[in-house]
Structures are given as structure tokens and as C-alpha cells.
Amino acid sequence: MRIGIEAQRIFRKNKHGMDYVVLQEVRELQKMDKKNEYFVFVAPGEDPCVEDTRNFHIIEIGGNSYPIWEQFTLPKAVKELNLDMLHCTSNTAPIRCKVPLILTLHDIIFLEPRDKSNKSFYQNLGWYYRRLVVPRIIKKCRRIITVSNYEMQNIMTKLDIPQERMAMIYNGYNEWFKPLEDTQEVYKKYIEEPGYFFFLGNTDPKKNTERTLVAYSRYLERSEVKRKLLMADLDKEYLDDIVERNHIENIKENIVIPGYIVNSDLPYIYNNAFAFLYTSLRESFGIPLLESMACGTPVITSNTSSMPEVAGSDAIFVNPEDPDDIVSNMLRLEEDDQFYRKQEKIGLQRAQEFSWQQTAEHLLNLYERVYKHR
């Protein structure tokens, strides 16, 4: 088979969720499949993190913007290479594509009501682009992959797609997320002392940052320990608005926001955290849940969308819209050592059920089925 994989953004320096997913899929396929020929389409960038091998060819193609790259430059390159299929990995694909198309549709949040006020121009453009493109390509796809049973049911219902055209393939997590001794004290690049709560909030309303910060304020009022809260990045003006609106000035001297955390440092951040807060209103999967659990760090997560499916039935679940529920579980971890140790073990065991190798194996099986029935 001659397989094309769209991985447009994996060479950029500051990668995000979908970039890491396709990067790990490509790396695992490189390890396991020496028979088929792959063409991985990327945009030029500062971090050439994948190299050519005998049967894997990295195709760098330029373009002034993502829509132009995907709708014009990519189809032209695909046509010239005479591929058997093209796997587009980040929710959208070329509207005009001459080869069998596989689409990974991580979620359909772009079809749901949203608050555009906190979004950048680029984020708003992406939202409109997905709303325009996805309905036009969805019926052309041979298979639509998504990352959880929750999201698969959501997609089937809202886009009227029969189950036989869907494939659910779980994400994995990187093998360097594991219990580690931070002998170099890497965490000190971001926060002075270990034993903090870690939270990946941002301005996206679905990340539930405001309610989580309200919960943290109430935690500080009730806790004798008063642990710091480490957040990766948050706009200062956005934070100030939350503090003023909710009268939670007490969080200001206890919250640490160092900016972007390098991915290679994240295992040390999780290992030195007391617990990880993943209190989103909605997630299609939630790789950070697995990363934290694989490091042996207890997680407090939401009882909504895919999070119970990923975290497993024995994890700590809260109502993300109830700050008091979040606080109660933060305090329970802090005050009940036996419960804390149990959650460490539960997380380690649950994380073992996921891997990028499994993800790649399922992908290869899907490619073979599409090729057979092309």
C-alpha cells in the first residue's frame, strides 16, 4: 500500500494535542510496519521531529495558511504520488480528493454553541473553517476515526453517520510518562516547591477554568496545607477578570503561571504534583489523564463526556459545574492518606490499558480494510 498521512503541524516548535497524536502514530507505524510505503505530509517548521526511513518519506510542502495548504497544496502533492489512500488526522480534509479518504475527527465541538469573545482571530477562523469543511467531506470519507465511544456516538447522532463507517481508536500516551525521581529538580524551572495541584486551564470555556479557580479559592480557605496551584499558561487579563468577578483575591499569591511547559518536562511536573485537576466541561478523550495516572499522580476529573470512559470507574469524579464538589475531593486526597495511596495505584493500573502501539496497530488494520475494499 502507498499510504498518505497528513501531519501538517508536527514540525512546529510549540505542539498541541492533535499534533502530538499524529506524531506518535507516525513514530509507532515506523517501528512496526516495514512493508507498506508511507508519505507523511508536513509544513516546514523549526522542529523536524521525524526523519525519512526506507519506507517512510517526509514530504515538506509549503502554504501561506492552513486552509490553502489543505485544500490546494496537499491534494496536488497527493495526486502526483499516486497514493492508495490519504489519512487526514486533524478534523478536516481536502474537499476535492482523488484518492480514498480516511478522516480522524477528534470531536465536533465546532458544531456546538460557543463563546467567541475569548478566542483569537486564528481560533475563530479555524472554527468557521471546520464548520464549512466537515459537512462537505464527511460523506466522501471511507472511514471516520474518532477517539472515544462517547465521541463516536456524538458524531453518529449529530452528523447522521452509520456505525459501519465509523472506527473508534483510543489514543495512547508517551512511554516517558512514568514514576520518576527528579534528581535534577526539573520542576524548579516552573515552581519552587513540589506537592502542588497541577491544572491545564486556559481561556477555552470547555476547560472550566473559572469554576476550577473558584474551587481553588475555597480550598485555600478550608485547607491547613494550602498547596500552590501550577497552571501551564493563562492570559493575565483573563485571570484578573475571573478574580474580580468572583472576589477570589486569595488565589493570586498562591497560583503559579510560568507559561508554556516543554513536553519533555511534563513527566517531572506530574511526578512532583500532589494531584492533577482535569475538570473540563467536555473532552473527546483526555491524554493528560493518562499522563498523570502513568506517573502515579492521582487525578480529579469530571463525570462528563469521555472522561469516565478514559479514567476508568474507580477514578475520582466530580461535577465540574460544582466548585464545592471539586473542593471536597481536593481535601479528601489531602486528609486521607490511605485513599490517596489507593488512587495512585488505581491510576497506574488504568494507564497500562492504553499505548500508542495499540493505536498504531488499530490504524494499520483499518488501512488494510480500506485498501481491500477500495
Explain the meaning of each model-derived region.
Residues 1-374:
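Carbohydrate transferase catalytic cores enriched for Leloir-type hexosyltransferases
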